[in-house]
Amino acid sequence: FDNRFHKFLKNVIMSEAQPIGKIIDYFYRVEFQQRGSPHTHCLFWVENAPKFGEVENDEIITFIDKYISCEIPDEKEDKELHDIVMAVHQHSKKHSKSCKKKGTVCRFNFPRPPSNRTFISEPSDPDKDSEDDEELAKEILSDLWEVIKKHEDENLDVSEIFKKIGLAQENFRTYYRFITNRNTVVLKRQPNEIYTNQYNPHLLRAWDANMDIQYILDAFSCVVYIISYISKAERELGLLLQQTKNEAEEGNLNAQQTMKKVGTSYLHHREISAQEAVFRVTGLRLRECSRKVEFIPVGENPCRMSVPLKDLEKQQSYKSSNRKRSN
């Protein structure tokens, strides 16, 4: 897996072909969910990518449509991609236990709504929108799902589905605001694609396995996402081992007994899959980013030690004060 992913990263994603644009930075974290096989969470920074809130939404939508799709390819025109999408990119209509982890019908929000075109839905404004507007929106969207379910075997397109409940695309966009509590990208999607996960055609053809590619609207959520995966599952274990070490010291155990106690605690509280065990034993990287940091031990104190942010701020404040005095 590690070899395949790195070749995919280097020879496809970072290649001159630029399947999702020119990548200027990246971060990834390998995860082993439920003691199973590895999968990778990645973030890519694309050169000159439009930023939400700084440009018109239409520019962002054009960017999204260029690189992201949830279309089921025509079997006659592109059988290879069609077969891959149908084999690895269809969410189960029965849903799995993982879907219901957070007490919802599907935490991945499948089925996804059909739409004639991609748009960015921004939450409704309580100061401008009434409760009656919200109730009407929820009623119409509920009717939409009923119609989709009733005619799922008839291969109708979005316009035909909308027509059956007297709904226009712009009205759908307006009503959709009432069921979202954050900025959301709604992709262009036909009724037969409501269980299709989004993908990039070039990446999917090369990787030949499930992916979930998204444009980031919320930078803060993105930062939280990065931090959570950098330290995922390791913080709790670290606290446990520290507690075990403290207990050993309080019991006046020698070094050998302390190591044995810590090792036993690790083995009894850390469940790992065979794949993760191999990753760790062989020294394969669980996370990596494009920005490399190398510590060079120079100066009077060559110890490698992180400096707290508050100390750095004090140093900066001290330097600023000295500059003012010298002026």
How would you name each of these model-derived features?
Residues F1-T40, F44-N327:
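Intrinsic low-complexity, intrinsically disordered terminal tails and linker regions enriched
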